[in-house]
């Protein structure tokens, strides 16, 4: 496949990336081994399809809760394979069961794109102005679709599987919470997901026990005062002074009241107030985010923020309205689920398993893990050459060899399950 960080059209399938390598860490049963051989054969026959699917989805991105065409595309391929997909309430996203009845493993992919303009220059770049797949969800969807079709061709599976093609990951509090509310988790005992990581080279997959993402909440503080002349601040409530007090005071006091080992950080993203140098403004606004890697701390943040803000602003006389929007909890990888991921990753080769750190970003996969144990891993998508572009950049692209890696890992988790 592509040997650069861009998914070029010239010979995208130069060869399979993965050499399957059993070792002392990845012993498998004969049934699992034959299943893996069958998956390998399916991949050899369908690598072109994986690339074409990803490029089709990439060229036709859809924003959160509008993923109708993507849902129809996935549903059509699942139906063609003899499976029975069920579209989720709202008409975007779907679930599909494979394998025997009874307790199931859940595999999830998010489907939505971002509201930004793509500047990759690719022949299959977004055809929708202002909308782009810059977070790898086109790859996530393709990998889960490939996993579904590969597993569907096996005569039997050791465990039932529920595929969840999820809408609206990019908007808080995320589409996962609606998927859970719809009852789609009924019978699912464990959940797994992959997320593209441009910091890891293709062929490597990172995972860790414990928190791998952070909780992410949003604060909007609207302030109001009578306003006045800057020569007479004593006759009014100095709104700009009050804003400055909150800008420095809230992050500072949070850092003194919360254990630093929780990786809690409060950062302002936007501040606005006034226009004239000699007029104390009547209104102002601050917005920012609070992130933490600790689930217990997340539950304490909102009341603590409200208490601190009130204490900071009360002496100023400025009126305020605090809008605190809870986002998502951290994704906390459960031990056994992480070990299952690690075994599947090691089967790729001796250097495939990578260490990874906790991210400050939020991920709504965490809502599934509020219901059942599970784990998320980071799929390397960097070619190893050129610039490492970050997620959510308008020039972001990925090495398409990662599609095969993702299918191998997810199918292997299923085949090893008992």
Residue ranges with predicted function:
Residues 94-95, 114-116, 122-132, 138-139, ...:
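Histidine/acidic-residue-rich, glycine-tolerant segments that coordinate divalent metal ions
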Residues 35, 46-49, 53, 66-77, ...:
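General structural feature for long, well-ordered alpha-helical segments within catalytic domains
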Residues 2-10:
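Extreme N-terminal basic, low-complexity initiation segments
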């Amino acid at each position: 496949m592509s040997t650069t960080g861009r998914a070029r059209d010239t010979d995208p399938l130069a060869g399979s990336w993965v050499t399957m390598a059993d070792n002392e860490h990845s012993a498998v049963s004969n049934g699992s081994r034959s299943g893996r051989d069958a998956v390998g054969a399916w991949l050899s026959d369908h690598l072109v399809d994986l690339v074409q699917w990803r490029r089709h989805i990439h060229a036709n991105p859809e924003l959160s809760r509008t993923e109708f065409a993507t849902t129809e595309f996935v549903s059509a391929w699942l139906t063609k394979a003899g499976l029975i997909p069920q579209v989720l309430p709202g008409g975007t996203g779907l679930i599909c069961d494979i394998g025997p009845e009874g307790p199931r493993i859940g595999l999830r992919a998010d489907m939505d794109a971002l509201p930004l303009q793509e500047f990759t220059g690719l022949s299959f770049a977004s055809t929708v102005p202002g909308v782009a797949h810059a977070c790898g969800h086109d790859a996530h969807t393709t990998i889960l679709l490939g996993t579904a079709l590969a597993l569907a061709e096996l005569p039997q599976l050791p465990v039932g599987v529920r595929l969840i093609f999820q809408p609206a990951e990019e908007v808080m509090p995320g589409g996962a919470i609606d998927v859970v509310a719809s009852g789609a988790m009924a019978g699912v005992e464990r959940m797994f997901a992959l997320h593209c990581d441009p910091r890891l080279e293709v062929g490597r997959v990172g995972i860790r026990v414990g928190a791998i993402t952070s909780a992410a909440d949003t604060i909007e503080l609207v302030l109001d005062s009578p306003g006045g002349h800057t020569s007479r601040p004593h006759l009014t409530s100095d709104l700009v002074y009050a804003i400055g007090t909150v800008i420095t005071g809230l992050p500072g006091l949070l850092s003194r009241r919360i254990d630093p080992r929780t990786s809690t950080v409060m950062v302002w993203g936007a501040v606005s107030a006034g226009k004239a140098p000699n007029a104390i403004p009547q209104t102002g606004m601050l917005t920012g985010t609070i992130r933490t890697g600790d689930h217990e701390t997340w539950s304490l943040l909102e009341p603590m923020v409200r208490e601190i803000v009130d204490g900071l602003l009360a002496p100023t006389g400025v009126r305020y309205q605090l809008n605190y929007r809870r986002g998502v909890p951290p994704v906390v990888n459960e031990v056994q689920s992480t070990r299952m991921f690690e075994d599947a990753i090691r089967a790729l080769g001796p250097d495939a398993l990578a260490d990874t750190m906790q991210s400050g970003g939020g991920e709504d996969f965490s809502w599934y893990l509020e219901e059942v144990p599970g784990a998320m891993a980071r799929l390397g998508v960097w070619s190893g050459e050129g610039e490492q572009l970050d997620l959510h950049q308008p020039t972001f692209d990925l090495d398409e060899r990662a599609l095969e890696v993702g299918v191998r890992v997810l199918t292997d988790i299923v085949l090893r399950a008992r």
